[in-house]
Amino acid sequence: MAVKIRLARGGAKKRPFYRVVVANATAPRDGDFLEKVGTYDPMLASDNSERVVLKKDRIEYWLGTGAKPTERVAKFIEQAGVTLPEKVKKEMEVKAKNRKARLSKKEAKEA
């Protein structure tokens, strides 16, 4: 079973609120999850300490079992001071390179 650490949207229309959850990769975005490991409120100021709240010990446990964070959640985890496994860091770098290559290719095609 592939497990991901990702965001699940909540809140009302135009007032998003996200839970950071550990879920099966094939489960729907807002569907069943294994564990809630934090919250993210994008409506708060970026310097507010309540904007991103994470359970560091549980995230470390899930990363140790092989759960893969999404790009946004990986940024939150790094900002919280949790070290990501080298494999995850390399995968993120490769994705970033591929994204840049696609964008430059698209821009060249449009020009």
From Swiss-Prot:
GO terms, biological process: translation
Pfam families on file: Ribosomal_S16
Top-rank taxon: Bacteria
Sorted UniProt keywords: Ribonucleoprotein, Ribosomal protein
GO molecular function: structural constituent of ribosome
GO cellular component: cytoplasm; small ribosomal subunit
Similarity section: Belongs to the bacterial ribosomal protein bS16 family.
PANTHER family: 30S RIBOSOMAL PROTEIN S16, SMALL RIBOSOMAL SUBUNIT PROTEIN BS16M
This protein's name: Small ribosomal subunit protein bS16
Organism: Rickettsia rickettsii (strain Sheila Smith)
